[in-house]
Curated annotation (Swiss-Prot):
It comes from Oceanobacillus iheyensis (strain DSM 14371 / CIP 107618 / JCM 11309 / KCTC 3954 / HTE831). Pfam families: PolyA_pol (PF01743), PolyA_pol_RNAbd (PF12627), tRNA_NucTran2_2 (PF13735). GO terms for molecular function: ATP binding; CCA tRNA nucleotidyltransferase activity; magnesium ion binding; tRNA binding. Its cofactor is Mg(2+). This is CCA-adding enzyme.
Length: 400
């Protein structure tokens, strides 16, 4: 029996079929169903052309109509509906120069990357498996559909996808597929870096990331990646033995940087075209690590480290130092903090200006606020304005 996500999407297939077209669930959603994993995105393949799909459904978004894909909105969800197709020649290492729509499911499945993704399922749960993908799933084997070198030449990202699937699913990559990955590996350098970043993020999240890293080393894939092209491949070798799944690319960059501090954080961010969000989280993780190295876990560390980064920090310490930190320890310390943020401090810039009316504004205000903030957080000074004022007046700041 098919699961709830497929039942929700079934009316789309029913509409296609009742109007004389074919319609199937395809790809990763079918694979994940067989593996009893959570279903995220459901993709649909059909014999209907994009124009015919748009005619059948009221809410559609023609996101990739030139390649046969439209998004159908149904039940508050978005579903990619793609016309059966054959791909033309690939010259940009990503997309075919042209596509030819076909009416045969077999032709559509034949163009897909791996056998475990070349699966289709109808609304009754009947699976179409032309390339023994179910057998490969049982064997935990990653194998290309058809000629491996052709598949990787069409889109070199498939090389990284194969390694990513080994990390996520614990699969072994079939020998012929491995050989083709090695032969075509240099084409990875032609890929858009944003696509590489997405694959690496997913790869490092996998439960079998150590296995994936070994593939990267053995196939010399690291030498094709930004920054690593300059001979920094020892980073992967250094991280392999103690790696654990890393849940964000910020954690990945933090590990890379701490294993080789000669490469600046800015260079990682720039070369992998990361967002400011990733940049800020990376910097906070690295700063927290360095503080931890000097002071251990204390009030100030938990004050400056956002709760959302705790788990990433714990993973970082484990990978770099082989030290296990319990989240409960962080929770217990945080529960005793006198303040959670600076706005709770019983001192502000106006207080300091009032207490030192003859001093011009300057850096001394910021420095003094930070010093008092640290003393209060570390419980060396009560968060009481009267006592804080006495301390400030007894420790007059440098006016410069």
């Amino acid at each position: 029996m098919i699961s709830e996500p497929f039942l929700k999407a079934s009316p789309i297939l029913t509409t296609l079929i009742s109007n004389g077209y074919e319609g199937y669930f395809v790809g990763g959603c079918v694979r994940d169903l067989l593996l009893q994993k959570d279903i995220h995105d459901i993709d649909i393949a059909t014999s209907a052309t994009p124009n015919e799909v748009m005619h059948l459904f009221k809410k559609v978004i023609p996101v990739g109509i030139e390649h046969g894909t439209v998004i159908v909105r149904h039940g508050g969800e978005s579903y990619e509906v793609t016309t059966y197709r054959q791909d033309g020649e690939y010259t940009d290492h990503r997309r075919p120069n042209d596509v030819r729509f076909v009416t045969n499911l077999a032709e559509d499945l034949r163009r897909r990357d791996f056998t475990i993704n070349a699966l289709a399922m109808d609304t009754s749960g009947q699976i179409t498996d032309l390339f023994h993908g179910q057998d490969d799933l049982k064997k935990k084997l990653i194998r290309t559909v058809g000629n491996a070198e052709e598949r990787f030449t069409e889109d070199a990202l498939r090389i990284l996808r194969a390694v990513r699937f080994s990390s996520q699913l614990g699969c072994t990559i079939q020998e012929d597929t491995l050989e083709a990955m090695f032969v075509i590996r240099k084409q990875i350098q032609h890929l858009a870096v944003e696509r590489i970043t997405i694959e690496l993020t997913k790869l490092f999240q996998g439960q079998h990331v150590s296995k994936a890293i070994q593939y990267i080393i053995d196939l010399q894939l690291d030498e094709q990646l930004p920054i690593f092209q300059s001979g920094k491949s020892d980073i992967f070798k250094a991280m392999k033995e103690n790696i654990t799944p890393l849940h964000s690319f910020s954690e990945v960059i933090a590990v890379f940087h701490l294993l080789d501090p000669t490469i600046k954080i800015h260079d990682w961010i720039k070369n992998y075209k990361c967002s400011n969000h990733v940049k800020n989280d990376t910097i906070q993780l690295i700063n927290a690590y360095h503080y931890y190295q000097s002071h251990g876990i204390n009030n100030w560390l938990l004050y400056i480290l956002p709760t959302k980064l705790w788990d990433g920090f714990i993973r970082l310490i484990y990978v770099i130092d082989r030290t296990t930190i319990e989240r409960k320890q962080l929770e217990e310390i945080t529960a005793t903090l006198p303040i959670d943020k600076r706005s709770q401090l019983h001192l502000d810039g106006n207080d300091l200006m009032n207490w030192f009316p003859h001093r011009p504004k300057g850096k001394w205000i910021k420095i003094l606020l930070e010093e008092v903030e640290y003393l209060v957080v570390s419980k060396q000074l009560p968060n009481e304005k009267k006592i804080i004022k006495e301390w400030v007046l007894c420790n007059q700041p440098d006016p410069n």
